[in-house]
Amino acid sequence: MLTVPFEEPDMMRESQFGATFTRQEDVRTLSSAELKEAEDDNTDREEEEEREEDENGLPKKKGPRKKKSEGRGDRVKMRRQEANARERSRMHGLNDALESLRKVVPCYSKTQKLSKIETLRLAKNYIWALSETLSAGKRPDLLAFVQTLCKGLSQPTTNLVAGCLQLNARNFLTDHNGDVSFSGRPAYDSLYPYPNAEMATPTGLSSGTRESVKPFRPYNYYASYESYYDSASPESSSPHFDGQMSPPINYNGIFSLKKHDEQVEYSKNCHYGMRYCNVPGRGSMYRVSPDSHFPYDLHPRSQSFQSQDELNTGYHN
């Protein structure tokens, strides 16, 4: 099959678009003035579109972002400073009010400061307890008053309230539910936690368990009583002690222990309870009968003591 050879004009034929715009045509560059005019035209066109949309009730388009001027930045900064000053003044007023409230509620402490929430809780309980007392019209029960006062408070706050009311915080402990539970011990057991001669039950046991507990007897000094007075104590069942007492002993120059032939009349202005001695001019807090003195010669610091030579003489003889 014979074919017609390609002719050069047919191979180099250009399209209609290429015929219209020749390839050798240079690109025209726009000057800066022409660019500015084009931007202004675009801005005007956008503003007109926004006005048309506003008039038609359609959502407004966001226009071009405005540049922050120097005056606008100063105004924003001034508004922020004024808002901070208002917030600071409000917090100062709140703190002053809470400080005044801490001085009114019954747990003011100079060393420990209540938190804001604990102050508000205690103030609420205090107002509620006072309202119940006024509605009852009679003298309130201390335990019930403290129970209402410490409801929902933490243990440190409960300790502060107990210290302010001069109570023992162990008598009313706050559980996890916020309720206050009281122990069965009487009030004097918490004030005087040591056993005395008249108490037949160890300290810390409730009244319900005292019947089932075997009574105990505290330590007494009947043996020393017999060795000193050469006679058996009426309340003691121990045998008589006839042995010779050891040489005089000096305890730091304060107590001198020796054996006398005659009984010494003790001064009546010094009553001994437990381990405390009455100070001249002051009342003793713990008093016992004068007959239960210890068999020791107690010399105040103002009195003179025996010299060491006299003590050594009695020892060598």
From Swiss-Prot:
Q: What residues does the bHLH domain cover?
A: 78-130
Alphabetical GO CC annotations of the entry are: nucleus
What are the entry keywords?
Answer: Developmental protein, Differentiation, DNA-binding, Neurogenesis, Nucleus, Transcription, Transcription regulation
Keyword Membrane applies = no
* UniProt region (Disordered), positions on chain: 1-90, 297-317
User: Which spans does this entry mark as compositional bias, Acidic residues?
Assistant: 37-56
Q: Does Transcription appear among the keywords?
A: yes
**Taxonomic superkingdom:** Eukaryota
Q: Which tissues show it? A: Embryonic olfactory bulbs and olfactory placodes. In adult, expressed in brain and eye.
Q: Where is this motif: Nuclear localization signal?
A: 65-70
Q: Which GO terms describe its molecular function?
A: DNA-binding transcription factor activity, RNA polymerase II-specific; E-box binding; protein dimerization activity
Instruction: Give compartment(s).
Output: Nucleus
Instruction: Tell me what happens on changing residue 89 to N.
Output: Confers ability to induce ectopic expression of isl1
Composition bias type Basic residues, residue spans:
59-69
Any GO BP annotation: positive regulation of transcription by RNA polymerase II
Q: Which portions of the chain have biased composition (kind: Basic and acidic residues)?
A: 70-90
List, alphabetically, the CDD domains matched: bHLH_TS_NeuroD6_ATOH2
Where are the compositionally biased (Polar residues) regions? Answer: 301-317
Subunit structure comment from the entry: Efficient DNA binding requires dimerization with another bHLH protein.
**PANTHER family assigned:** BASIC HELIX-LOOP-HELIX PROTEIN NEUROGENIN-RELATED, NEUROGENIC DIFFERENTIATION FACTOR 6
Q: What does this protein do?
A: Differentiation factor required for neurogenesis. Does not act as an upstream activator of isl1.
Name of the protein in its database record: Neurogenic differentiation factor 6-B
Protein's organism: Danio rerio
This protein's encoding gene: neurod6b
